[in-house]
A protein has these predicted regions:
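A broad detector of the eukaryotic-type serine/threonine protein kinase catalytic domain
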Residues: 19, 95, 181, 223-225
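Short, aliphatic-rich beta-strand segments
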Residues: 46, 213-224
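Mid-to-C-terminal catalytic subdomains of enzymes
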Residues: 120, 147-201, 205-215
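Acidic-residue sensor for enzyme active/binding pockets
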Residues: 59, 198, 221
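Conserved beta-strand segments that form the floor/walls of ligand-binding pockets within enzyme
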Residues: 23, 175, 221
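ATP-dependent adenylation/nucleotidyltransferase module used to activate substrates
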Residues: 1-162, 203, 218
């Protein structure tokens, strides 16, 4: 299918949902999804965002302004991943536990608004990577409209640009927990240290980089833009 056919299918699928809550991170995928859902369903859409220390502040700058401009009802919840014993020990499937807890909170907010359908921004590209968090989506019956319409990251960028979304060329961020090797304890102090280091690099003008922690050694990865 070409991108316009996928776009038409996406809107048709969304129309059938009726009333929905969008898991909104402020990134490329969820911003595009939220925009299309709102265009199709209007006030039958709410956005629910989760703020954690594992998401650098710079990654969601602009998201609250976007939602306000669109006139979408927006809920923001604070969640401390460190409270999950199965997460802070950093096992290979940590994303599953974290994702499930986050989704349960979103489901609770949606239920209070009389909404039973939750959607997220997963797309075709997500099927190519190791994504233990997808198990949580399946278990909790979360819908992925972009995936159902066969949309790739490239499709989403093209359509986001056409819609004039500020996120159309935004890079996909990686959770701060990914900066640690499996089995390395994730603590608030270590996350704060990495956030500070990455902000210094961002202030220098770099956009594609990671600071990874290996015991007491920090490794900086930078990609030429």
């Amino acid at each position: 299918m070409d991108v316009e056919t996928k776009y038409a299918l996406l809107k048709e699928n969304i129309k059938n949902y009726g009333k929905i809550a969008v898991a909104y991170s402020g990134g490329l995928d969820s911003t595009f999804l939220l925009k299309v859902c709102h265009d199709v369903l209007g006030d039958n859409v709410i956005a629910v965002s989760i703020r954690t220390d594992l998401q650098p502040v710079r990654e969601y700058l602009g998201s609250e302004e976007f939602v306000k401009k669109e006139g979408i009802k927006h809920f923001i919840l604070k969640f401390n991943d460190y409270t999950l014993p199965c997460f802070k020990n950093n096992p290979p499937d940590r994303c599953y536990y974290c994702k499930k807890e986050i989704l349960l909170r979103i489901i609770n907010v949606a239920a209070n608004e009389g909404i039973t359908t939750i959607v997220d921004g997963s797309n075709m590209d997500d099927l190519c990577d190791y994504r233990p968090g997808r198990r949580a989506l399946t278990e909790l019956h979360i819908k992925s409209p972009l995936l159902e319409a066969g949309m790739t990251k490239k499709d989403i960028r093209v359509l986001s640009q056409k819609l004039g979304l500020y996120t159309w060329n935004k890079l996909s961020p990686a959770c701060m927990a990914s900066r640690f090797p499996y089995g390395t304890a994730i603590t608030p102090e270590r996350i704060a240290m990495l956030n500070k280091a990455e902000q210094v690099i961002a202030d220098l003008g770099f956009t594609q980089f990671r600071v990874r922690l290996h015991d007491e050694v920090a490794r900086i990865e930078v990609i030429n833009d």
